[in-house]
């Protein structure tokens, strides 16, 4: 770690965090543009975020959003197949893309004087992707192989997939981003083109440019390259089916001979961050850190790993940056000789004790300091800032929400954390899953 960075973080922890240097504007065709200045190095990150993800797919076409992400690296009228990434590499940069339930994003990291070229190429494929049947056949096999390796070949991923399907019986968050295999196998060229032509348009996108740039320069380049693109009149409102009230806890046991380290996971339905109202999500963020954010001092680790010595590891997770309600989760992996049933019982006892007594005040203060440090480190690179703002804006939050978030986290009280804990940590609102070798079954 550089000493200058350490000193800067210590100074920031002692007082209010510095505001990001952000400029925003919208082109006439509806493209939202965010410019984040960071002049420490002559480099720039360009990201284009589309407000379309796996939870927005038409029924029966699971995986089409991720499939299209792969196909976007095929050719256009002006660029041959595979030339996009090759050109980025020839200019000393890197590029990639990713898909979630709520968005699909593409990025390039290059020298600042290559931004003009990157915008030209990214704007070109926004509305002029050309696909052949061979392109689709080849890339469909690629995503099927990806599913085989990352999901079907990994018992933990299969458990996560089954738990999401059990948690979200009506909402599309229960459908895997990569897709169900039988639907992936049927995805066609026309499916991809229909999804692309309807949703990949300036009025459904956010352009983030972060690095050694000036807002006026970015505006001129955006007008030059993205400005002429026609908006889409086929973008649908993000009105997804919502979950009915969950009236009873749900359980599943996945047995797989490949499992060498059994564990249990419980996920509770939990609210998302909402624009202008982020306090409950902030309280849940602090709660996750208190319960399982540290392998030595968190509530679960201290009680299960060190005091009772029944767990090898434990964790808690929550990320409310989503369009709709998502999950708050707990993980526990027992030591050899302790059954999953006993580990679950111990976990429940620890959670019940926490709900009764609340957090240790000194630990609560330490957690907030650690959260503040993590926020500062997360904003320390242009690429990190681009991703931070892009993700938030893609799910309906605002620039102000992003800038307010660190101070909202710091202002959360113990009472707010405990109120959120009592509301969310309800067994009737949860799915509990066991991942185990074939010899251990549910009690």
Pin down the residues of each PLM region.
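Active/ligand-binding-proximal structured segments within catalytic/core domains
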Residues: 30, 39-87, 278-292, 299-302
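Acidic/histidine-enriched segments that form metal/cofactor-coordinating
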Residues: 50, 76-77, 83-195, 368-383
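M16/insulysin-pitrilysin zinc metalloprotease superfamily fold
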Residues: 109-140, 294-295, 320-378
